[in-house]
Amino acid sequence: MVLNHSPPPGLYITGLGSQYPPYLLGPEKLEEFAARFYDVESPGLKKLLQINRSSGIETRSAIRSYESGFATRPEAPTISELAEFYHQAGVDLTTQACKKALRESQISPQHVTHTIGVTCTNQGNPGFDLLVNRKLGLSANVDRMLLHGVGCAGGLAIMRAAAQIACGASMRRKPVRILAFACELCTPNVRHDLAFAEKAPNAENISIAGALFSDAAAAFVLCNEYAMAETEITPLFQLLEWGNSLIPDTVEHMAFFADVDGYRTVLTRDVPQYTKHAIGPMFEKLLPSYQSQIQSSSGEGVGEVAKSLGVSDFDWALHPGGEAIIEGAKQVLGLTEDQLQASREIYRTRGNSSSATVLIVLDRLRSLGKREYVVATSFGPGLAIEMAMLRRCEVDED
């Protein structure tokens, strides 16, 4: 049998939307809150609060202050209470991010063909994506997908899933307009983070999640070439390559699961050591295909440039999982502060909002970064690494 080898489908991000909640909490707020309910001299909690002071985060975005809601009660919220709260506040936050992405794409809700959602801070069936779809007024015939179990890697996992769906549609010569979104409400779980730290038998066994995580939602619209033929807008990015991989023998270093006392986070101090050594091999694996696609779709001059592309030629949307993760990537890859400025800014001013963060960094990179070539990468339980390689559709020549 002879197969016709057609060029890769065209995949374009036409809109991005980020949405933070109204509150910003400094490290001192967590200390004051912890002192109200817990023994701050216990070894585990004392260590967590030390990390909180030295995390490099100036403010974390929060859906509520430490003076309202669950924070005012003597007992921690139950999982069912957290779920009910998420279905209101989380769905509202996600809807706002989605509206921004749709507005920039100039796509009406009725023309969305697929939705892909992700979260690790809400469980249940039907998933929160159905509530978002209803609030946006999407068609009842929209194809829905909700990812689970991918944690902080979720933002790029939904981009990978969107790309695969769009490629399949292109093979069938059908237009797709995929609305993908991520939302995490981490701060309502802080009572459980503090309680687990207080009970820890020693300072070595604590999770540092209570000092890092914040709340946010993000969304993007991805269209294939058939959908782009029906619009006159200039897309933001072309998505050219993507991939994911597990880092061997690391499954015990990151987790988030329902415990009898609430949601529990596992995040060991060894994570940055593993993640920093996983980025380079994934980049080298994806680069040849990325270069080939640029060469085949560009003029001779750009094609020659593509042959020599390396780490230093890209703006990096690195998931800022922590100060050590950012520093580790910078050290191993030889990145400059200029290449990491969006990741630094989001981490410093908003903290780590899990799956939504890398998409927010990519959104911020639009105004901070200047390079034509962009790579985004994030990490999640497994340990897993996700990577996407993009190309700006409009480049500032200044």
Curated annotation (Swiss-Prot):
The chemistry this enzyme catalyses reads: 11 malonyl-CoA + acetyl-CoA + S-adenosyl-L-methionine + 12 NADPH + 22 H(+) = soppiline B + S-adenosyl-L-homocysteine + 12 CO2 + 12 NADP(+) + 12 CoA + 8 H2O
UniProt GO BP: polyketide biosynthetic process
Q: Tell me which InterPro entries the record gives.
A: Chalcone/stilbene_synt_C, Chalcone/stilbene_synt_N, Polyketide_synthase_type-III, Thiolase-like
- State the UniProt keywords alphabetically: Acyltransferase, Transferase
Q: Where does substrate bind?
A: S214, D215
- Pfam entry (one): Chal_sti_synt_N
Concerning Gene3D superfamilies, the annotation shows: 3.40.47.10
Q: Which cysteines are joined by disulfide bonds?
A: none
Annotated active site residues, numbered on this chain, are C152 (nucleophile)
State one molecular function term (GO). Answer: acyltransferase activity, transferring groups other than amino-acyl groups
User: Under which pathway is this protein filed?
Assistant: Secondary metabolite biosynthesis
Q: What is its EC number?
A: 2.3.1.-
Per UniProt, CoA binds at: K47, L48, L49, Q50, I51, N52, R53, S54, L267, G321, G322, E323, A324
By sequence similarity, the record places it as follows: Belongs to the thiolase-like superfamily. Chalcone/stilbene synthases family.
Described function: Type III polyketide synthase; part of the gene cluster that mediates the biosynthesis of the alkylresorcinols called soppilines. The biosynthesis starts with the HR-PKS pspA-catalyzed carbon chain assembly through nine chain elongation cycles, using acetyl CoA and malonyl CoA as a starter and extender units, respectively, to produce the polyketide soppiline A. In the first round, the KR, DH, and CMeT domains work to produce 2-methyl-2-butenyl thioester.
Q: Subunit composition?
A: Homodimer.
State what protein this is by name: Type III polyketide synthase pspB
Q: Which organism is it from?
A: Penicillium soppii
